[in-house]
Amino acid sequence: MSETAADSGFPPWLEDPWRRLVERARAGRLPSGLLVTGASGVGKAALTDRLLRALLCQRASGTEPPCGECNACRSLGGGVHPEVLLLQPEEPGKEIVVDAVREANEFLSLSGSGDLRALVIRPADALNINAANALLKTLEEPPAGAVLILESSRPARLPATIRSRCQIVDIPNPPVPALQAWLGAFAPDASAVAEATAASLGRPLAAREILTDPEHMEAWQRDREILSGLLDAQAVLPAAVAMQRSLPETLLPRLQALLVSAQRLALTGETDAFGSQFPADRMARFVRRHGPRGLARLAARAIGWQRQAGTPLNPQLRMEDIALAFIGARSG
């Protein structure tokens, strides 16, 4: 399963929630339904995977970390274990359909070789309404030994009936000093760590990817170039066209963060960490040009654009909507 680094690299902000879950499991009090929430890149999958490895490890006991050497640990590390099923969309951005949930329900109902059978749904907010209804029946009457772990960065998209059947385990972003201390193990350059922290919007695993994976760094640089273009009245249209080369799930949250930075600059004269990633003169001109009211309107629109990111809205229409909003939002 993904995000399963060696335990020496297990994110420290996940230790406490992991330990609490393991203690409950050892005491026979682990809920049959868990909803792990938190921002994308905070470590939900890492928490889930380490929890399952600890519970299935043939050597670990109490709150000891998984050994990483037994057959169960090796199987989970390789992404295959007979008692664990990972349910994901067939393609990123697609829905999880009802037939997939029915197969998962059948998996949970089969007797296995151990006491634990786990279904991990990643991300749970990809369930369509029929799939969610099929899952609800299992959450209401789970088979003996079954544990369902739902992960979601957008839990509000889940039906209330699903959320109410799960115990919520929320993972907040760690404080910036703790995050940057952890990131320092991957890049000793403090300025690079600060840039990755800002670019990731404080999401730890996303920040690590920016530091260690050239493709993620290139994606951030591409997004920054697009956003910088939106700040320039003469470059809005080319920047909007360039959005087609970017991923909405990374660009739109950064667009929202940029507008928050601009509002902060307009109201306090201060530049926050994300805003400091852009030319100061361009930010200042953008703030003067749109004024507090125009910035507030753009920020409200940005929330809507981000909500639309998981919908089948034509990217061309979104691009045009953003361009028109930036061109027409001027007002003091």
Go through each PLM region and give its residues.
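Clamp-loader machinery-focused feature within the broader ASCE/P-loop NTPase space
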Residues: 1-130
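Conserved adenine-binding aromatic site and its adjacent loop/helix in ATP-hydrolyzing domains
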Residues: 106, 137, 160, 164
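Short, surface-exposed loop and linker segments with low hydrophobicity and enrichment for Pro/Ser/Thr
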Residues: 127, 136-140, 246-249
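Conserved amphipathic alpha-helical interaction elements at protein-protein interfaces in regulatory
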Residues: 57, 110, 140-141, 329
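Alpha-helix capping at helix-to-loop junctions
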Residues: 110-114, 129, 141-144, 168, ...
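Charged, glycine-rich active-site and insertion segments that engage polyanionic ligands
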Residues: 1-54, 72-75, 144-147, 153-332
